[in-house]
Amino acid sequence: MAQFDTEYQRLEASYSDSPPGEEDLLVHVAEGSKSPWHHIENLDLFFSRVYNLHQKNGFTCMLIGEIFELMQFLFVVAFTTFLVSCVDYDILFANKMVNHSLHPTEPVKVTLPDAFLPAQVCSARIQENGSLITILVIAGVFWIHRLIKFIYNICCYWEIHSFYLHALRIPMSALPYCTWQEVQARIVQTQKEHQICIHKRELTELDIYHRILRFQNYMVALVNKSLLPLRFRLPGLGEAVFFTRGLKYNFELILFWGPGSLFLNEWSLKAEYKRGGQRLELAQRLSNRILWIGIANFLLCPLILIWQILYAFFSYAEVLKREPGALGARCWSLYGRCYLRHFNELEHELQSRLNRGYKPASKYMNCFLSPLLTLLAKNGAFFAGSILAVLIALTIYDEDVLAVEHVLTTVTLLGVTVTVCRSFIPDQHMVFCPEQLLRVILAHIHYMPDHWQGNAHRSQTRDEFAQLFQYKAVFILEELLSPIVTPLILIFCLRPRALEIIDFFRNFTVEVVGVGDTCSFAQMDVRQHGHPQWLSAGQTEASVYQQAEDGKTELSLMHFAITNPGWQPPRESTAFLGFLKEQVQRDGAAASLAQGGLLPENALFTSIQSLQSESEPLSLIANVVAGSSCRGPPLPRDLQGSRHRAEVASALRSFSPLQPGQAPTGRAHSTMTGSGVDARTASSGSSVWEGQLQSLVLSEYASTEMSLHALYMHQLHKQQAQAEPERHLWHRRESDESGESAPDEGGEGARAPQSIPRSASYPCAAPRPGAPETTALHGGFQRRYGGITDPGTVPRAPSHFSRLPLGGWAEDGQSASRHPEPVPEEGSEDELPPQVHKV
């Protein structure tokens, strides 16, 4: 524990989420006028249940689904016990003859009930098996616990059912066809009538998201800052990512809601974690707790492993029989879902994005099939298919062939072999275009490391993308190994990071009026957590430690503003969005001039545009990606970025969401959700009673607008990164047992950091050519918005970039030691101000 020595920058609150004068507001309502939903104490749980009931399509569907989950667990346990103790496999495999007639020479047809043991024999065999009795007792206790929890949840969800009917005035029959934005708008309106939260007069969309996603935002931030041990370097296999549902459950149990966790309740961090005086003691306490939970996982490993195997067998056996190539399909990994998730992004919003990116991601991964593997698969399919064809022909000629021993088994195995081999044979009409596919993927998933662009054809890019988009078989294998690996990760990998986790929660927690303690990254404040290379130059005061990696703050802000057009961002965020809108207008105008004069019209590009319906917003993405490679003559690489950016900006200018009451035809004036007011605001933000069909169409336009902005912002980021004189490598310092400090970067004998490019936050320190247009962009941003401050904001001293929080940062040519100045320990706690600040 002596090596737990890190330096964290103090985080100041940047703006007030409440109107002026409401910071200490407590709304008083007369006793007789209170509604059943006045002053709900646990709004986190309440809003989460409101959201879950909406996603489960109403109370009836949720009730039936919960009942079937209970029955499913009971079925797995009972059916497994029956197979182990109540079946005579000698009769089933014809090793023992059964004769029901009086004449032994007569042939007898064996039926399935003949293989079942009598009830008395079955009961006796169960009672004689002590290990089986132990497993059944544990399973019974767990099932009773789930039953009690089910009854409690049903009572709570019945209250949510009444809230939908009477407060929101949404019948259960109409709920499956209502978008979440409609439900959320009615919740905001209900706050004015019933005062659900008494600490604020009005609720905002961000308040509701903070309540529902409080812990999820912390998890996204922990993954973004590489504090959780998810990446491992395996001998002979290289770098691998291991993140399963069981491991995630243990992380949440330790940090958020388990006994002895960091949080006092759903909305408040414990007071001792808000000060730095007891950080070492708290880290030791957290380390011990992680150790005990790891030991508990180790003791329960056999039971959990048995359950994982049985559940996987019963879940995927039928799928394999019906579709043998299903395990060759791919899915988004759990790490990928957490890495690609925006701050303040609900589960259905994330799932919608990933679903749109699934097909191009599958096509991209299919571009890298091994030629040798393809050759082996073709010949394997030929030999297995030939034998299978002969057996099928013989069966058609005489069905008695199936009565021959192992013929049916052989036919089944040969069919599976042919199906698996065909999955490794590429489509003969497939065109190898990885760069275009990667741009389409980026338009939907919104996050991508810098070094992937221009290197989409390389195997390294494919391997790194496979960590986000893995085989279904790999996903199942990781879940089966999770009971064994999880205790090892907790004990040997998570415990050394206890102090860094304690410091993270102290320094990145803010108290929002009417919401409680939230992750400061979830505020999406470009001044506190913006990155200069993501259009935040001149607006951010964050040190390199406080910056969110991969443009998470900027992209999350843009996504939330587009998804919730009625939301009014704070001043700095409004300035950021407004400046981006102006930049889009300038680049779009330049692209229009270039198309008219400098760039000749391309026939293929024109044909693609004519084939795409203008009423479909997704056609814009296809036009942008196709136009990047089809329009005009080939350009040098340094000029391709400008052309790509101009094309995306032109698409954004021509992109027009629907006006109220307008059919989805044609294009109109460009709109962008920069300040929270645009064409969609009048239809989806201000009116609660708009049509369901129009809401769905507007949602499609919003997702397409965000896809175009993701492409545009990544292109701007790429040009800004090239304009930097040098870029800095940031990596998390692994805890070592030696305790030796790293040499100064500017000192003699300094070593260059290990170059492992992974994302936008892992650039190599190398000089880059400047870009005059990006420098002008920075200067214009500083002139236009650099002087904006909030009234009442405490001025902050400039951050000292020479310090190395978490080990590994050094800027401006300054040297820094690995171990910074220590934080005062116990006894000086009164001298430290609280580390949680009201917002």
From Swiss-Prot:
| Lumenal face of the membrane | 85-128, 398-406
Q: Which reaction does it catalyse?
A: a 1,2-diacyl-sn-glycero-3-phosphocholine(in) = a 1,2-diacyl-sn-glycero-3-phosphocholine(out); a 1,2-diacyl-sn-glycero-3-phospho-L-serine(in) = a 1,2-diacyl-sn-glycero-3-phospho-L-serine(out); a 1,2-diacyl-sn-glycero-3-phosphoethanolamine(in) = a 1,2-diacyl-sn-glycero-3-phosphoethanolamine(out)
Kindly state the positions of the motif Tyrosine-based sorting signal in this protein. Answer: 8-11
Residue ranges the record marks as coiled coil: none
Where in the cell does this protein reside? Preautophagosomal structure membrane; Cytoplasmic vesicle, Autophagosome membrane; Golgi apparatus, trans-Golgi network membrane; Late endosome membrane
Gene Ontology biological process terms in this record: autophagosome assembly; autophagy of mitochondrion; bone morphogenesis; innate immune response; negative regulation of interferon-beta production; negative regulation of macrophage cytokine production; piecemeal microautophagy of the nucleus; programmed necrotic cell death
Biased amino acid composition, Acidic residues: 737-747, 823-832
Which ranges does the record annotate as intramembrane? 291-301, 320-328, 471-480, 484-492
Keywords (alphabetical) are:
Acetylation, Autophagy, Cytoplasmic vesicle, Endoplasmic reticulum, Endosome, Glycoprotein, Golgi apparatus, Lipid transport, Membrane, Mitochondrion, Phosphoprotein, Transmembrane, Transmembrane helix, Transport, Ubl conjugation
Glycosylation site list: 99
Q: Name one Pfam family in it.
A: ATG9
Q: Could you tell me which residues carry N-acetylalanine?
A: 2
Can the keyword Transport be found in this entry's annotation? yes
User: Positions modified as Phosphoserine?
Assistant: 14, 16, 18, 656, 735, 738, 741, 828
| Chief location | membrane
- Biased composition annotated in UniProt, kind: Basic and acidic residues: 724-736
Q: How does it assemble?
A: Homotrimer; forms a homotrimer with a central pore that forms a path between the two membrane leaflets. Interacts (via cytoplasmic its C-terminus) with ATG2A. Interacts with SUPT20H. Interacts (via the tyrosine-based sorting signal motif) with AP4M1; promoting association with the AP-4 complex. Interacts with ARFIP1 and ARFIP2. Interacts with PI4K2A and PI4KB. Interacts with ATG4A; the interaction is direct and promotes ATG9A trafficking.
Give the family from UniProt: Belongs to the ATG9 family.
- Official protein name in the record: Autophagy-related protein 9A
Source organism lineage? Eukaryota, Metazoa, Chordata, Craniata, Vertebrata
Q: Which gene produces this protein?
A: ATG9A
